[in-house]
């Protein structure tokens, strides 16, 4: 009874935060559909002006501030991804609490008069670990990701049903803020497989999103490869693009369809070892101004990027280009939530499209910035304190073989006698440090496409240790099946005047150091 009253109180508080018109719509439910060259909100033409925000990249205490920042820009909608791997970090164990409470985030959007577009994957890209797919899928070696692999599709359906439990009641038809739900994500950049995309659509519908408007996004160059007749088609492109050209083909095949840029890239992501990416504010503002003048809907990706906390940053391909923790994206609202000059230039332009209404005031930052004084670290513990498990094997095991998603592995083997100039070769994902008898020999860096290292001379029985750190899994393209650790066999090659000799050590000790907060605290206290 007490729980029921609490729920009723929260619901009433949410309704009271709305305008009278919004309150009536919330009580009765509404409609969002496609009309003749326009979207229709409750039967009236509506231009979607969406701000892309990702709830896991923003501390929950700041969610409402960021939403209000977007509203003060002149946005009427928030667009978000649902990240499968943050909600199901262990198979079958779902977490929609705390910073993962996507339903609470959507309710905050509604409280502040914003509609919501939900993009539940299963794949999301987003410069996020493995594009949002859980690492534990890789424990099934023959799995085919983003295809009609039976196990993959089974797990997708289970996840999407959990998303439905959280969000289906929040669609506009039920009085909630959700006006659109996306099916898959930019599949044209991955392949051509309409049966797979159709199956994902059916799963999304069965998860409770059977009445809300469904759409799929892609690039203008490939959207027809997987376009489903019953879905709305939207385009993704960035600043500086020729707007008319981006929608030319869509206009030819669907002349009466509404136009929407579902990702208008405000900036770009950063990778390790490169300069911070920036894009001119002028190009962004002019592109959005042109779209609004033509009645074209959009979602600004990103309006606020935030931070890929912990191990959640992904990596790009071809090659291996890990993303940094910051997801600032050169967005109008910077990583820590402050308005940039780009924000105010955009706000000035957006004020032309408010039907004469004054934009809300820009909210103050929820907390002031501080300067951390110089300090010295005086205590440390050996890395080996963090070891939580080990296994013997006749070849190196991957993280996934050891049931570990993220962290570091320590591989140890005994060497035969080797002469100076012998070469160690293997596939190391992602950064390997090599020691012989406890002495550091060198590193092998996947970022630099390194696969080998020269070894010093060593007597028979010497111990070789390889410490491998895993970085973010690739989140784009066919390389998303990205195992971590030492992948396959390791070889040691020597050459003399008579012959070349290549050998593979057959006895390995594999030890894991998981990337886990509790594990780190335990290691420090050991």
Regions found by a protein language model. Give the residues of each.
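Active-site neighborhood of glycoside hydrolase catalytic domains
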Residues: 151-229
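Aromatic-lined ligand-binding clefts that engage carbohydrates, nucleic acids, or primary amines
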Residues: 421-435, 526
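Aromatic- and acidic-residue-enriched segments that line the glycan-binding/catalytic groove
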Residues: 92-100, 110-111, 122-147, 197-201, ...
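Catalytic-core region of carbohydrate-active enzymes that cleave or remodel glycosidic bonds
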Residues: 114, 206-207, 211, 240-334, ...
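N-terminal carbohydrate-binding accessory modules
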Residues: 24-77, 107
């Amino acid at each position: 009874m007490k729980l029921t009253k609490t729920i009723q109180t929260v619901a009433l508080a949410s309704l009271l935060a709305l305008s009278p018109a919004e309150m009536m719509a919330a009580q009765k439910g509404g409609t969002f559909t496609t009309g003749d060259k326009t979207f229709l909100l409750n039967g009236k033409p509506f231009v979607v002006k969406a701000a892309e925000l990702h709830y896991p990249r923003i501390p929950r205490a700041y969610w409402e501030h960021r939403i209000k920042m977007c509203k003060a820009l002149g946005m009427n909608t928030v667009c978000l991804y649902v990240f499968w791997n943050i909600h199901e970090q262990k198979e079958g164990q779902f977490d929609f609490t705390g910073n993962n409470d996507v339903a609470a985030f959507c309710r905050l959007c509604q409280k502040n008069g914003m509609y919501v577009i939900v993009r539940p994957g299963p794949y999301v890209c987003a410069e996020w670990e493995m594009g949002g797919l859980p690492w534990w899928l890789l424990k099934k070696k023959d799995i085919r990701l983003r295809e009609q692999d039976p196990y993959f599709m089974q797990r997708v359906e289970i996840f999407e049903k959990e998303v439905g439990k959280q969000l289906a009641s929040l669609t506009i038809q039920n009085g909630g803020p959700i006006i659109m739900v996306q099916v898959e994500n930019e599949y044209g950049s991955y392949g051509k497989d309409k049966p797979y995309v159709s199956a994902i659509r059916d799963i999304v519908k069965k998860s409770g999103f059977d009445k809300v408007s469904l759409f799929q996004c892609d690039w203008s160059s490939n959207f027809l490869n997987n376009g489903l007749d019953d879905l709305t088609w939207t385009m993704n492109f960035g600043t500086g693009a020729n707007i008319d050209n981006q929608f030319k083909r869509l206009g030819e095949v669907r002349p009466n369809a509404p136009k929407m840029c579902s990702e208008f890239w405000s900036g770009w992501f950063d990778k390790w070892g490169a300069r911070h990416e920036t894009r001119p504010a002028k190009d962004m503002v002019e592109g959005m101004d042109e779209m609004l003048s033509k009645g074209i809907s959009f979602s600004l990706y990103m309006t606020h990027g935030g931070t890929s906390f912990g191990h959640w940053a992904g990596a790009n391909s071809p090659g291996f280009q890990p993303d940094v923790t910051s997801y600032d994206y050169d967005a109008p609202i910077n990583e820590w939530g402050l308005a940039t000059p780009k924000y105010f230039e955009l706000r000035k332009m957006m004020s032309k499209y408010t039907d004469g209404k004054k934009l809300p005031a820009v909210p103050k930052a929820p907390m002031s910035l501080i300067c951390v004084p110089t300090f010295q670290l005086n205590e440390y513990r050996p890395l080996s304190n963090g070891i939580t498990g080990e296994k013997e094997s006749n070849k190196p095991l991957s993280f996934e073989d050891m049931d570990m998603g993220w962290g570091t592995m320590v591989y140890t083997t005994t060497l035969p006698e080797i002469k100076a100039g012998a070469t160690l070769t293997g596939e190391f994902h992602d950064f390997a440090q090599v020691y012989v008898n406890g002495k550091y020999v060198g590193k092998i860096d996947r970022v630099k496409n390194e696969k080998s290292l020269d070894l010093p001379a060593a007597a028979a029985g010497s111990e070789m240790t390889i410490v491998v750190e895993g970085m973010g899994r690739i989140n784009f393209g066919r390389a998303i099946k990205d195992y971590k650790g030492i992948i396959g066999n390791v070889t040691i090659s020597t050459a003399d005047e008579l012959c070349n000799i290549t050998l593979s050590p057959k006895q390995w000790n594999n030890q894991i150091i998981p990337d886990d907060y509790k594990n780190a605290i335990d290691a420090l206290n050991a």
